[in-house]
Every structure is written in structure tokens, then in C-alpha cells.
């Protein structure tokens, strides 16, 4: 019995060692409730997992992430914001502000992001843009700058809207991209992490307290920021950023259930974060490959005799910055970053120093994640009639 028990212990030890050396591949993402979902690398912007990631859908109050960012970038916290009739008439959820009331912009940002007040969003939009329509134009301009490909904002609060550009919508991928940008703003993060906030209008006669509706902050370790949303058309929506195991993830969910299924978004967000933690690790660009030397015809041979006759070889340089080399990418264990070059087989003189000759590309899963120009390290002159005369003179008279 002792021998068998010892053998069993040895067997189990061997299994554990093998599992540590060859860890099993983590399971794929379990079935999600959301109609559209994205898990994004918050540092590189790469989509790690997508379900209908590029499908245009209404996104309800997750719109307010963009509203808040523009207010932070274009306004000042101590600005006086006056409430218009249009702002005061917005439907629930609302702060209940009255036409003519004044607030500090900073206070309204807490109302906007913690309790998701629709009247607050319109008041902010009118203050920053002059009107809701002009503010929507700023929102759409910013979305394009961030790389969004199918986003159109009409309202600052995410309520259904339509104009000459189409209906109010985004995609899970674009929404994740917007959050990846927003999480870099420390004031945005501070506001959205606040659990409770009390403020008054400028007169000091009316006080308000708002509570954060983003329960995921206290449900999941590492959640940095997030924004919930719901309309009858959009369903429950959610976008958040989380840093887990030193990895920055962005989760975006659209159409994640309707009334009666309010907690579906928390379940889906957890599944995506678990998938990211268990499947991805950080890597940087690999060592820059050695670039070939390009033959140049009709060129003055150099003094190092690297060329012969009327040709020489051109050394190349790839301008890869330290910032690019330090940038991190989340990769699966089975993924690698590879280099590819686009270079001509030969050139004709003259060639200028730093002249662009081609390009160097880093690719991950067949998609380009980085590129830079490849340039000439030195200049190469073209052989001329005068060069031939001087050459003959040197060869025969010296």
C-alpha cells in the first residue's frame, strides 16, 4: 500500500509539473447576452474579442462618455452653466433643474456621469457648443479623430435622435475606442470613480446628491471607470475600463438585455475580462530586422569598394522611435509579431541622404500594427561625363 500511495503521489506531482510547463489553453469566451460586444486592449486599441463588433446600434447613455470628455477638454470646471428651457424639459432620468438656474460645470459633470441625468447633458452641450446641434458636430469630429468608423452622434445624452447625417448610433468597437481615450484623462477617471457627490446651484438655495449607478466598480476587482446606459430601443448598454494583472482592458456591450435582465451586462463584462486575463500577455515589437543593401546603378563607387564598375550598394535605415519600441501589445500565447519590408530590388542614382526608399511593417495576426519609412543612410551621386574624365586622368596621369 505504501508503494502504491508513493506511486500515486509521484504521478500527481508529475501531472502538476506538466501542467505548469504546458498550461492548458484557456477556454474561449462563453456565450454572451449582448447583441454586440468588444474586449479591447486599452493600450494599443486592438480588438481582442468581438461579437458583431462593427454593427451599428443605439448606445443610450454610454454617449455621455464623449459628452464628458469634450466638456473637460473645451470647458473649465468653474464655468457658470445656465439652464435653458430645452435642457429643463428633458425626460427622466433627470436632475430636475429649472430654466434660468445656474450651476458650476464641474458639478454638472458628476450629475452627468454618476446619475446619468439627461437635462444635465443638454445644459453642458449648450454651454460648450452653443447649441445641441453644434455640440453634436464637435462629438462627431472627435469620434473621427479617435478613429471611429461608424459612429454618429445626434444627442449629448444618448436619447434617440436623427438628423441629416442619420440616426444616433455607434458600434461596440467605436465605443471601446472612445473609452480607451477617456480613461487616459485623470479627471474623467476621478469623476467616474466617485461613489456619491453633493452640490448646489450657484445661488446655494438648492442642494442635490447623486449616487454612482456603475455598480461594477465594487463588483469586479480592477475596474477603473465605466458608464451604464438604457433606452427601450438600445437595451442595456455598458462600457468600462479595467486594469487586471497589469493589463488594461476595455469592455463595450450594446443591446445587453431589456427590463428584467438588468444584470446581464455585469455577467458579460466578467466573462470578457476573464477571457482577457487568461488568454493574453503583453509583448513589445521584436528586434528590428537587418535591412538589405540595395544595388544602385549608374552610381559613383564608394571608397570602401562595396560596389564595382558603375554601381554601388545603398545602406538603409528604419526610423523606429523609442516610443514605438516601448509600446505594448496584448498577445495570445500562440501569437507573434512579425516584420515585413517593402523595398525595391534596385535603384538608379542619384539617391539623396534620408530619401524614402520603402517601408517597414510590423504585423500581428495578419494585420498591420506599426509601420515606418525606410530611408537612405547616405547619399549616392550619379556618374557624369566629368566623373569619367577625372577618373581617366587619375588612373593614367597619377
List where the protein language model places each region:
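Structural motif marking the loop-to-transmembrane transition
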Residues: 3-4, 101, 105, 385
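Hydrophobic alpha-helical segments, especially transmembrane helices
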Residues: 3-6, 65, 244
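Sec-dependent N-terminal signal peptides of Gram-positive bacterial secreted proteins and lipoproteins
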Residues: 2-25
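Active-site-adjacent loops and short helices of periplasmic peptidoglycan-processing enzymes
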Residues: 21-186
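Domain-terminus/edge residues, biased toward the C-terminal soluble/receptor-binding domains
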Residues: 166-398
Amino acid at each position: 500500500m505504501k508503494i502504491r500511495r508513493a506511486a500515486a503521489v509521484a504521478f500527481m506531482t508529475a501531472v502538476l509539473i506538466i501542467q505548469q510547463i504546458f498550461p492548458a489553453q484557456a477556454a474561449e469566451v462563453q456565450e454572451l447576452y449582448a447583441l454586440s460586444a468588444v474586449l479591447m486592449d486599452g493600450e494599443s486599441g486592438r480588438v481582442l474579442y468581438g461579437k458583431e463588433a462593427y454593427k451599428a446600434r443605439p448606445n443610450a447613455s454610454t454617449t455621455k462618455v464623449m459628452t464628458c470628455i469634450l466638456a473637460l477638454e473645451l470647458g473649465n470646471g468653474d464655468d457658470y452653466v445656465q439652464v435653458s428651457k430645452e435642457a429643463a424639459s428633458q425626460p427622466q432620468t433627470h436632475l430636475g433643474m429649472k430654466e434660468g438656474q445656474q450651476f458650476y460645470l464641474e458639478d454638472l459633470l458628476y450629475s452627468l456621469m454618476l446619475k446619468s441625468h439627461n437635462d444635465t447633458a443638454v445644459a453642458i452641450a449648450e454651454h460648450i457648443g452653443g447649441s445641441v446641434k453644434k455640440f453634436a458636430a464637435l462629438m462627431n469630429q472627435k469620434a473621427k479623430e479617435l478613429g471611429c468608423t461608424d459612429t454618429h452622434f445626434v444627442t449629448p445624452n444618448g436619447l434617440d435622435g436623427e438628423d441629416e447625417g442619420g440616426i444616433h448610433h455607434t458600434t461596440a468597437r467605436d465605443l471601446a475606442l472612445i473609452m480607451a481615450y477617456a480613461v487616459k484623462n485623470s479627471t474623467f477617471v476621478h469623476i467616474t470613480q466617485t461613489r456619491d457627490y453633493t452640490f448646489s446651484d450657484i445661488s446655494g438655495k438648492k442642494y442635490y446628491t447623486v449616487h454612482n449607478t456603475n455598480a461594477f466598480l465594487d463588483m469586479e476587482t480592477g475596474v477603473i471607470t465605466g458608464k451604464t446606459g438604457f433606452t427601450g430601443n438600445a437595451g442595456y448598454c455598458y462600457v468600462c475600463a479595467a486594469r487586471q494583472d497589469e493589463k488594461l482592458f476595455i469592455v463595450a456591450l450594446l443591446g445587453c438585455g431589456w427590463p428584467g435582465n438588468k444584470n446581464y451586462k455585469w455577467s458579460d463584462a466578467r466573462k470578457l475580462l476573464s477571457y482577457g486575463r487568461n488568454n493574453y500577455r503583453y509583448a513589445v515589437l521584436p528586434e528590428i530586422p537587418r535591412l538589405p543593401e540595395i544595388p544602385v546603378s549608374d552610381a559613383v563607387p564608394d571608397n570602401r569598394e562595396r560596389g564595382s564598375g558603375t554601381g554601388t550598394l545603398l545602406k538603409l535605415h528604419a526610423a523606429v522611435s523609442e516610443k514605438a519600441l516601448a509600446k505594448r501589445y496584448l498577445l495570445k500565447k500562440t501569437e507573434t509579431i512579425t516584420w515585413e519590408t517593402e523595398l525595391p530590388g534596385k535603384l538608379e542614382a542619384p539617391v539623396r541622404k534620408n530619401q524614402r526608399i520603402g517601408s517597414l511593417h510590423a504585423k500581428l495576426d495578419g494585420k498591420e500594427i506599426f509601420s515606418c519609412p525606410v530611408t537612405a543612410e547616405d547619399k549616392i551621386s550619379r556618374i557624369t561625363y566629368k566623373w569619367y574624365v577625372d577618373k581617366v586622368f587619375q588612373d593614367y596621369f597619377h
